[in-house]
Design a protein with these regions (language model features):
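Alpha-helical interface subdomain recognition
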Residues: 1-82, 92, 104-109, 116-120, ...
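Glycine-rich phosphate/pyrophosphate-binding beta-alpha loops
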Residues: 159-164, 209, 246-250
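Cytochrome P450 C-terminal beta-domain/meander region
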Residues: 134-155
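Short glycine/proline-enriched turns and hinge-like loops at secondary-structure junctions
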Residues: 67, 135-138, 163-168, 182-185, ...
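Flexible, small-/acidic-enriched active-site or ligand-binding loops
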Residues: 138-140, 144, 196-225
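A short, Trp-centered hydrophobic/proline-enriched beta-strand micro-motif
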Residues: 119-128
Length: 331
């Protein structure tokens, strides 16, 4: 365990088992309802609160357990064994949901809002993608400084944004300096969703990930105080890319959890399926397939652990972003 953690090794191991039992038990049963409604029931959010899903990854000063990144991802591997839409929500909750504000928020905003993540008093979404501008320096949403009001005025649209049905704030990346080149054009903001001019726009259903709240967003003259800027002016792409680097490893770990469960199911099926008088697990061709599956799963787990070793030493280390990308690509 991380020496700064507030729980013991035994408590952590018990928590891993608790999470696995939770996602393979009631969460899998609830998914039948979610497949029809495309909405998470309130009992899902309450269960996450009761089982510390919104708390466990937070820094100690904000109600968390002080876990290392390796330990955080061990928890994620367990809940990734469950339904994909729920996994997506819990993956985001344990990473981008709070990490962007923690890493780049202004001190007074962090002090006000960071303690509210632990019990889902607040939740966020990450608004980068646009229909016509992709996810890079070619974005078209703008925030223009109004000298008279002393505020930024946000206009534009976002697309394919997750968790909009259960969040109160958006991390918005937009253009603040159109005359500059490349990434320097962009800045990031912590945007309250209850501001006048902030609109949620329905979009066609996305295949898979039922319940995870995908919509578009539209901003019409949304007024933002200067303290809502994340990082400095012109650092919008830095905010996005640094945050997404860690998120890439969470996606890789999601794939790891899914793969591990599928591997276990494959072994069980190979033992049960009998052809010509013997289980197919006795057949060499099936054993080779299973061995290759286990080899790839083990390699992915080792790749993720290697990233964690670097990240836990220095989360701004030279190879953190590179190794995060390797994890996601390999998965």
């Amino acid at each position: 365990m991380n020496p700064n953690a507030t729980i013991t090794d035994e408590q952590f191991k018990a928590y891993l088992k608790k999470v696995r039992d939770m996602v393979e038990g009631p969460y899998t049963e609830w998914q039948k309802e979610i497949e029809v409604t495309n909405t998470f029931p309130e009992k899902f959010y309450q269960s996450n609160i009761d089982n510390d899903i919104y708390r466990y990854s937070l820094p100690v000063e904000y109600g968390g357990w002080g876990l290392s990144e390796k330990e955080i991802l061990q928890v994620q591997e367990e809940f990734s064994r469950g339904p994909s839409g729920m996994r997506m929500h819990m993956h985001y909750a344990s990473d981008l949901n709070w990490r962007i504000l923690n890493d780049f928020g202004q001190p007074e905003i962090k002090e006000k809002y960071m303690p509210l993540f632990q019990d889902k008093t607040i939740f966020t979404n990450f608004a980068l993608t646009e229909k016509s501008g992709g996810t890079g320096a070619d974005l078209h949403s703008t925030a223009v400084w109004d000298e008279e009001k002393g505020k930024w005025i946000l206009n534009g649209e976002k697309w394919l944004i997750s968790h909009t049905d259960c969040s109160q704030f958006s991390y918005v990346i937009c253009v603040t300096d159109p005359d500059k080149k490349g990434d320097d054009r962009l800045s990031a903001f912590f945007v309250p969703m209850d501001r006048p001019g902030f609109e949620i726009v329905p979009m066609p259903h996305m295949m898979g990930c039922r319940g995870s709240g995908h919509t578009g967003l539209k901003f019409t003259n949304v007024e933002l105080e200067p303290e809502l800027m994340l990082g400095k002016r012109g650092e919008g792409m830095k905010v996005a890319m640094h945050s997404l680097a860690v998120s890439r490893v969470h996606i890789a770990t999601s794939n790891l959890g899914i793969s591990q469960r599928m591997f276990e199911m494959s072994i069980a099926r190979a033992r049960d399926r009998v052809t010509f008088g013997k289980p197919i697990i006795k057949r060499q061709a099936i054993r080779v397939k299973l061995a290759n599956m286990q080899m790839m799963i083990h390699a992915l787990r080792c790749t993720i652990i290697d990233f964690c070793d670097d990240f836990d030493l220095d989360n701004n280390g030279e190879y953190v972003s590179e190794k995060a990308a390797i994890c996601k690509l390999f998965s």
